[in-house]
From Swiss-Prot:
Its cofactor is FMN. Substrate binds at K69, N114, R115, L116, G117, F118, N182, N187, N262, T263. This is Dihydroorotate dehydrogenase (quinone). It comes from Paracidovorax citrulli (strain AAC00-1). Binds 1 FMN per subunit. SUPFAM superfamilies: FMN-linked oxidoreductases (SSF51395). Its EC number is 1.3.5.2.
Length: 359
């Protein structure tokens, strides 16, 4: 159980610049994890196992990518009670991202806008941090799953994007429980073009081929080959016809799941609010319905068995239940953690555990 109520720390953090508060929090988590200080934010480990994409998720609540871009805080996040933690997005080479300021709170809407731009320390540093974590062996706790989210460098031309994704896939493959291919951030120029028909077909074809090659190679740790599931993260700003084409392409190339959705470029729900006109991706409550719409469309297009991770606008247990009813199998949170604190994690996990399971 967390020793420090978030209601006491949130005013201090919200009094700071949004990115400065983020960096301070990540530094604190990185320094305190695997020490007695970790109890300050530890949460109840809710057991609600679900089988998905050949994996056993300890519960149905995950940490979305983007919070821990450099995989510095894997164990700290796991201690909050997440059943799975996704870190990244990582790119082959380190890059600074977009100029600051680039993260803005919209508290009236329980929302954030960011245009960070895949700022990260690069693949080598990312893998070093992953190897330092002990997420597979947390004493007295159920092992969480670890997702590693990959992208392309901003300076890589879009026609060469596949090269970056394959470099990252090869690097993260031995360390991931699953890999996420991020083609939907609005903050890397032209990245969302990879969601178009021909571009997506080419990218996923190359990824599928490389994955099959990697899956035949014995792993150093076990001496046995392992097929790592691959998820693809898509945007909320898609027409139903685009969602249907993406769904077909995912299935054709043997992808194991889809994450719906990333942030939105729409400002319809926040017009008139301070910072609403800042460029970047909008997350939090205003993206909830768009995310749910895409999830419903995906479930219709993909059938009942294809894994869907729902993310976008979860600030309460009720929001998470709504995601599952829309068609998601499990959920992820990010902005909700910032506005509600770590207590949200077990609250959501318990609410989802209480839902009737399909027959």
């Amino acid at each position: 159980m967390s020793l420090i109520p978030y209601a006491l720390t949130r005013p201090f953090l919200f009094g700071m610049d949004a990115e400065a508060a983020h960096e301070l929090t990540m530094d604190m988590l990185a320094r305190g994890q695997r020490t007695p200080l970790q109890w300050a934010w530890s949460g109840e480990q809710v057991s609600d196992p679900v089988q998905l994409a050949g994996l056993t998720f300890p519960n149905r609540v995950g940490m979305a990518a983007g919070l821990d871009k450099n995989a510095r805080c894997i164990d700290a996040l796991g201690a909050m009670g997440f059943g799975f933690v996704e870190v990244g997005t990582v790119t082959p080479r380190a890059q600074p991202g977009n100029p600051k300021p680039r993260m803005f709170r919209l508290p009236e809407a329980n929302a954030l806008i960011n245009r960070l731009g895949f700022n990260n320390e690069g693949l080598d540093a990312f893998l070093h941090n992953v190897r330092q974590s002990n997420h597979h062996a947390r004493p007295g706790m159920r092992p969480m799953l670890l997702g590693l989210n990959i992208g392309k460098n901003a300076t890589t031309p879009i026609e060469d994007a596949t090269r970056d994704y394959l470099l990252c896939l090869e690097g993260v493959y031995p360390h991931a429980d699953y890999v996420t291919v991020n083609i939907s951030s609005p903050n890397t120029q032209n990245l969302r073009a990879l969601q178009s028909d021909a571009a997506l077909d080419g990218l996923l074809g190359a990824i599928a081929e490389r994955r099959e090659s990697l899956a035949r190679q014995p792993e150093k740790a076990t001496g046995r080959p392992r097929r790592v599931p691959i998820f693809v993260k898509i945007a909320p700003d898609l027409a139903e016809e685009q969602v249907a084409v993406i769904a077909s392409t995912l299935q054709r190339h043997g992808m194991d799941g889809v994450i719906a959705t990333n942030t939105t470029i729409s400002r319809d729900a926040v017009q008139g609010l301070r910072h609403a006109e800042e460029t970047g991706g909008l997350s939090g409550a205003p993206v909830r319905e768009a995310s749910n719409r895409v999830i419903r469309q995906l479930r219709h297009a993909l059938g009942k068995d294809f894994p869907i991770i729902g993310v976008g606008g979860i600030l309460s247990a009720e929001d998470a239940v709504e995601k599952i009813r829309a068609g998601a199998d499990v959920v992820q949170i990010y902005t909700g953690l910032i506005y509600r604190g770590p207590a949200l994690v077990p609250q959501v996990a318990k609410a989802l555990r209480a839902m009737p399971r399909p027959a």
